[in-house]
Amino acid sequence: MKILMISNHLGVQSGVQRYVQNLLLHLDTAKYRVTLFVGQCPPDQASTAPALEAHGVEILAVPDNKKDRIRALAAHLRTHKDYDIIHYHTASKIGAPVCGMMRVLCPRAKIIVHSHIVYPPMTLTWRAAHLVYRLFADYFLGCGVAAGRFVFGDHIDDKPNFSVACNAVDAGRFHPDAAARAATRAAWGITDTDRLAGFVGRLNHQKNPLFLMEVFAAMAAQDPHWKLLLVGTGEM
């Protein structure tokens, strides 16, 4: 079976690309021939490409620019019409006509569109995009119900061809470690009487860190022993 996976870029700081990497590294690439069509890695980030290529994933890296990527995708599909599945990770309105383009150029493929975003406000253009996505795609995924509704329409979760695809974490990589815990708390001046709340993730709009600060302020007002540790970087 031949699969074309379409992601944003190869950088490790991309939440979408990390999801793609986790997914593909657990896929049997002897059974499923996977081509990853993706933007080039930003110069300030490490690339996910080495691990994916070592696992047998073919990577087609193109300029990390929307217009250039769309042109390159069209050119690729004109000469590669034998994909069984196209899995398209999307977070934009422009993805809707791109979905139509994929249907025209690769008519036998099953098209999966996968939403990773909730970014209000809802506009008339977005509502038009809902109709286009639903006209051309076969299956719909969202990292949550809200993400599915935002990109594909209010009632998409009522459809049998919609599913939530959770951004899974390998729990086996995490386990209690008393020595590491003590060292980390000492390094950050956290005493045995302090209570620690933690956040691990990107500091951007989607993760809603401002609301986290409001919640923490209420917790600290009730008990001054609370401290908040943020692990991550981002636009905010």
Annotated model-derived regions:
Residues 50, 54-85, 95-105, 124-135, ...:
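An amphipathic, basic-hydrophobic alpha-helix
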Residues 88-96, 115:
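Short His-centered aromatic/hydrophobic patch
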Residues 67-71, 110, 117-137, 149-156:
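Nucleotide-sugar donor phosphate/pyrophosphate-binding loop at the beta->alpha transition
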Residues 14-22, 195-218, 224, 228, ...:
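A conserved mid-protein helix/loop that constitutes part of the nucleotide-sugar donor-binding site
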Residues 175-190:
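A short helix/loop element that forms part of the nucleotide-sugar donor recognition site in Leloir-type
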Residues 5-67, 161, 234:
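N-terminal strand-loop element at the rim of the active site
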Residues 137-175:
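A short, active-site helix/loop in glycosyltransferases that binds the activated sugar's phosphate group
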Residues 3, 85, 102-119, 141:
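Active-site proximal beta-strand in glycosyltransferases
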